[in-house]
Amino acid sequence: MGNCLYPVETLSLDKNGTQFTFDSWNYSFEDNYSYELSSDYSLTPAAPCYSCNLLDRSSLPFFMLTSVLGMLASGSILFAILRPFFHWQICPSWPILAELAVGSALFSIAVPILAPGLHSAHSTALCNLGYWVWYTSAFAQALLIGCYACLNPRLNIGQLRGFTLGLSVGLWGAAALSGLPVALASDVYNGFCTFPSSRDMEALKYTHYAICFTIFTVLPLTLLAAKGLKIALSKGPGPWVSVLWIWFIFWWPHGMVLIFDALVRSKTVLLYTCQSQKILDAMLNVTEALSMLHCVATPLLLALFCHQTTRRSLSSLSLPTRQASQMDALAGKS
């Protein structure tokens, strides 16, 4: 919206008259030329509205710290899942968990590319690649969590290796295609990787906003509604609720604010005050920062999910199985 360090000089009208001058704008007119108005108008609403970008160059430490913590956490949980002595039988959902860890790691790698203040990294190609990896990894994680919640109660997809592989390829392919609009619409402007104002790119930007709203906002609401209906109608368990659903808390506001911003840009929703526009710009920055934190939280959610699944699997061992193991031990001693 502009540079918040240099607010605009607003014009004021004398309430007792109908004249205003441009002396404060350093315009020199011969004989101090003035304009006559037929009525008392206020020019303040016509002044440009300048908003402060919260994610400017001063936020570079936040970007870098989030990236480092995300890569360390994602790498640690991925190593724990893929190590040879991991309890794959006790936690059969490990392929999905590994993909979520990979998605979180990819997002963490993309964060420095889009970090403000790193001018050396701000080439157009890197900007496009950064946004593509950023949103492709996020879309893939959302789709994996949603499909896992819907299909696992019926199919136990962790046990079906071929089905899991095909599902993963399809979901990652859909996520990669969904990330193309934002990659094509992004560019470098004044040292920042952003979406430049261009009518040629508006279709791509609106497509991206719609995809984000559908995946980040509509998908979790659909899961909650389906779960509620299944419980209310007593027609089966419905989507499997797990700690992984917390992931959507980091992205749900981002989808909501993006679609609202799209409505404002398309003049479908009108903001009549500069303060409203400033609040919207601030919310765009806040929700983007919140979504970035998911790369740190996701590995923790995966670790908690593995812990809960392991405890559930161990407690589900039948008593006859335990007794049989004890009898085998006694027979070996005799």
From Swiss-Prot:
Name of the protein in question: Atypical chemokine receptor 1
Gene Ontology, cellular component aspect: early endosome; membrane; recycling endosome
Isomerase recorded as keyword: no
Subcellular location field: Early endosome; Recycling endosome; Membrane
Cytoplasmic topological segments: 83-93, 152-164, 227-242, 307-334
Effect of residue 207 to M: In strain: C57BL/10SnJ, HMI/Msf, MSM/Msf and SWN/Msf
Keyword 4Fe-4S: no
Entry's transmembrane regions: 62-82, 94-114, 128-151, 165-185, 206-226, 243-263, 286-306
Membrane topology: Multi-pass membrane protein
Mutagenesis or variant effect for residue 76 to G: In strain: BLG2/Msf, C57BL/10SnJ, CAST/Ei, HMI/Msf, MSM/Msf, NJL/Msf and SWN/Msf
Species this chain originates from: Mus musculus
Principal location listed in the UniProt entry: other
Keyword annotations of the record: Disulfide bond, Endosome, G-protein coupled receptor, Glycoprotein, Membrane, Receptor, Transducer, Transmembrane, Transmembrane helix
